[in-house]
Amino acid sequence: MSNIDGKLPDILSDAVLKQSVPVPDNFVKVEGIDYSKPESRNMRSKDLIKSMATMGFQASSLGKACDIIDEMRSWRGEHRDKLEEHDRKGSFDNDGYQKTTIFMGYTSNLISSGLRETLRFLVQNKMVDAIVATAGGVEEDIIKCLADTYLGEFSLPGKGLRDQGMNRIGNLLVPNDNYCKFEEWIVPILDKMLEEQENYVESQGKDCLDSNFDQDSPVWTPSKLIRRLGKEINDESSVLYWAYKNDIPIFCPAVTDGSIGDMLFFHTFKASPKQLRLDIVSDIRKINSMSMEASRAGMIILGGGLIKHHIANACLMRNGADYAVYINTGQEFDGSDAGARPDEAVSWGKIKADAKSVKVYADATVVFPLVVAATFASE
């Protein structure tokens, strides 16, 4: 291609040197942390996350997650005294003003990990209003009160571990003896719960099983079972203990999908023909009612699957959550619930169209301690 006039051919100029439109005033400049500046050293967690928010990629999503959590926690509505009687439900702060009802969900592996202590901090300090966990998220909390979990390697061969009676959760190791200790601990409690159930039905009649929402009655639900376990463990390192102390319900719609399910199964043989009964219908009414009564609803979801959808579906009952923060590594391309972005939940009415929402694509054990340090624990 000849060039006798010293100019670029128009095709090159148009393709490579295309002019940009003026940059809008509200565009945010990409900047990172300059550690050569004194103010960038020994930063507080909140300042670190604020600085990361302009980095781009998941650092910016992390910053947005913290902003949303700060907003869901700081929102206040009307004072209780200004509300009609039927509106005096939901969550209120210590001064009597409406606040966001925060639903937190987490998967069992996060309790197996060292994130348990972070989650316990939130429950101990009444920073969430309801929890949805998988069965492992219940039993692993109790088991850690009875025996330790250890660091291992992702690459440890399963056959050798099985021969040694060691169970692997990622790069964590749980001796099988821990589950034996769990069985020894829980079976007498199940025996007592069955006895209380049978005595109650005998004294009240079978009608007592119908629509029984008495928190203290031995007409058991998964959340009542978990509350009882928190009471019985009586250990301040336990999430369940603090949930019991602070009257924070822990819902577990798949309570049989784990070691607890094994224990309940074994118990049917021991107690036969009597059986301990768990009413899941009362629990779905309870969590859905909490959502319907909330002045505003916020979701903090760590992981995916059942715990994510159970909270989102509860928020459908109020035409969607007002705030949503997802932290997981799931991708949406297989159509999984875990991988779905918040906008998919908007299409179902589970998150409001004008809600503040974000998904952080990251391992929750890396990200959530930073989130808590910059939000809940920064006061």
Swiss-Prot record:
Reactions the enzyme catalyzes:
[eIF5A protein]-L-lysine + spermidine = [eIF5A protein]-deoxyhypusine + propane-1,3-diamine
E.C. no = 2.5.1.46
Q: Which Gene3D superfamilies match?
A: Deoxyhypusine synthase
**A Pfam family recorded for this sequence:** DS
Q: Name one GO cellular component term.
A: cytoplasm
Key words, A-Z: Hypusine biosynthesis, NAD, Transferase
Q: Which SUPFAM superfamilies match?
A: DHS-like NAD/FAD-binding domain (SSF52467)
Q: Where along the chain is NAD(+) bound?
A: 108-112, 134-136, 140, 257, 304, 329-330, 363-364
Q: Provide the cofactor list for this protein.
A: NAD(+)
Looking at its record, which EC class is this enzyme?
transferase
Q: Does the keyword Nucleotide-binding apply?
A: no
Pathway info = Protein modification; eIF5A hypusination
User: Transferase among the record's keywords?
Assistant: yes
Which residue positions are annotated as catalytic?
A: 350 (nucleophile)
Signal sequence extent: none
> Per its UniProt record, what InterPro entries does this chain match?
Deoxyhypusine_synthase, Deoxyhypusine_synthase_sf, DHS-like_NAD/FAD-binding_dom
What highest taxon heads this organism's lineage? Eukaryota
In its UniProt record, a GO molecular function of this protein is: deoxyhypusine synthase activity
Task: Please tell me where spermidine binds in this chain.
Answer: 139-140, 262, 309, 335-337, 344-350
| Protein family (similarity comment) | Belongs to the deoxyhypusine synthase family.
Q: Which NCBIfam families match?
A: dhys
Query: What role does this protein play?
Result: Catalyzes the NAD-dependent oxidative cleavage of spermidine and the subsequent transfer of the butylamine moiety of spermidine to the epsilon-amino group of a specific lysine residue of the eIF-5A precursor protein to form the intermediate deoxyhypusine residue.
Q: What is this protein called?
A: Deoxyhypusine synthase
Biological source species: Kluyveromyces lactis (strain ATCC 8585 / CBS 2359 / DSM 70799 / NBRC 1267 / NRRL Y-1140 / WM37)
Record gene name: DYS1
